[in-house]
Amino acid sequence: MYGFLSHLHCLLQVANLTVQCSAMVPCLSINSKAQSDCDCCARSKGCCDFVGSGVPTASIKIQCPVATATRRSSHQSAQLSEKTTREVGQRRAMASGETVVVTGASGFIGSTLVRRLLDRGYDVRAGVLNPDDKAETGHLHALAAGAGEGRRLHVFRCDLLDGAALLDAARGCSGVFHLASPCTIDPVSDPQKQLIVPAVEGTLNVLRAAKEAGGVRRVVVTSSNAAIMPSPGWPAGEVPDERCWTDIDYCEKNGLWYSVSKTLAEKAAWKFAAEEGLDVVVVNPGTVMGPIIPPAINSSMSVLLRLLQVHVEDVALAHILVFENPSASGRHLCIESISHWSDLAAKVAELYPNYKVPKFPKDTQPGLERAEVGSKKLIALGVQFSPIEKIIRDAVESLKSRGYIS
C-alpha cells in the first residue's frame, strides 16, 4: 500500500521545492535540506501502524509536516451516514468508561484512530515503541490535551514480541486494535527474520494477550490490500473483494515479502480466532494518504501499478465501526476506488491545471479494468467514503499549506 501524498508530491514538482522528505529523495532526486525525527511515522525497529502501507523505517528519520497537516486538514473528511450520526451520542455514552488498546498508535492511521476513539469517549492505551521519545509520542499527548482528554490517554511501551507486556496492556480492556506491523521500503536480506516472523508472531502475541486478558470482547486487526492482491488467479475482469487472497507463491517468486508477511499474519489471525473462539474482525485498507513512497516495482509487477485509494479518516472510522457493531464479521475491504497511474495523474491535472503534471501512458495490461469499488460491508456499517477528488484536494492543500508547493 503506497503513500498517496508522496505520489502527489512527485506529480506536483515545482522549482521552489525547498524542504524535501528524505524518503522521497530516490524518487525526486532532490537533496534533503532538513531532517529530524518524524512525528507521524513509527520508527526504530521498523514497526509501524500498518498496515500495508509501506511506511518508513528506522533508516528514514524525517521531519514530516505534511502528515501533521494532513491529519489536521482531513479531520472532517470521513462522513457518517445519517443513521450513524444519530447513534453517535448513544455510542459515546456506551464507550464511556471503556478502555481499548491501540498498537502502532504513533503512526499515521494509529494517531487518527486514537483521536477518534478519545472523541468517542474511550480510554485509550496507546502502544508505541518508545514512550520516552517525544518525537514519537508528542503529537499523541498534544491531540489528547487539545481535546481535553489527556487523562484518558495512557502511552505504553509496545514490543510485539513481548507477550507479557502485551498481556498487561490488555487487562481490563474491552477491545484491542492491532495496527503495528514490521515493514520496510528497502530490500531485506532475511525476509523471515525481518518481516514474516515479527508480523506473524507479533499478531499472534496480541491475540494471545487479548484471549488471556479475559475481558476483551473483540479484536480489530489492521491487515492490508496487500493480503488481497496480487492474485493472478483471480477471474479477469472481476474486481477483487474480501474473498480474494494474495497468491503467496507468486509473491515469494517476485520478492514481494511485505505482501507475504501481511497475508500470513492475517491467515494466522483467522486460524487463532477459529481455534480459540476469539472474536476477530479485519480491516483491509488500500492506499492511505500519507508521506510515504512505494518500493520499486519491476516490469513483471506492472499489475500493481494501480492505486486503491482511501482517506485516513475513513480508515479510522472503519476500525471503530467494525469494533462497535456486533454484526460486523470477517474481512472488510476499505477502499474508495481502483485507479491507474494515468487516471491519477489526469485527475490531479484536471483539479489543478496550474501545475505541470506529468502524463503517463494509458495502462494496457490485461486485467487492469478501471472500476469503482464499493466496499459494501463498510458502507452498510455507516462509512461514506471520501471521493477521490476530496482525497486529492486534501492532499494537495496539505502540501501547499506547508510550503512544499506553491
Regions found by a protein language model. Give the residues of each.
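Active-site Tyr-X1-5-Lys
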Residues: 251-280
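Glycine/proline-rich active-site loop of Rossmann-fold NAD(P)-dependent oxidoreductases
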Residues: 275-278, 290-304, 322-332
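Substrate-positioning beta->alpha
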Residues: 205, 309-321
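Conserved Rossmann-fold NAD(P)-dependent oxidoreductase catalytic core, especially the SDR/UDP-sugar
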Residues: 178, 182, 187-258, 281
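Mid/C-terminal beta-alpha module of Rossmann-like enzyme folds, strongest
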Residues: 316-368, 395-399, 403-406
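N-terminal Rossmann NAD(P)H-binding glycine-rich loop of SDR-like oxidoreductase domains
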Residues: 96-123
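NAD(P)H-binding glycine-rich loop region in Rossmannoid oxidoreductase-like domains
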Residues: 111, 129-201, 213
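Conserved C-terminal active-site "lid" loop/helix of NAD(P)H-dependent oxidoreductases
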Residues: 364-384
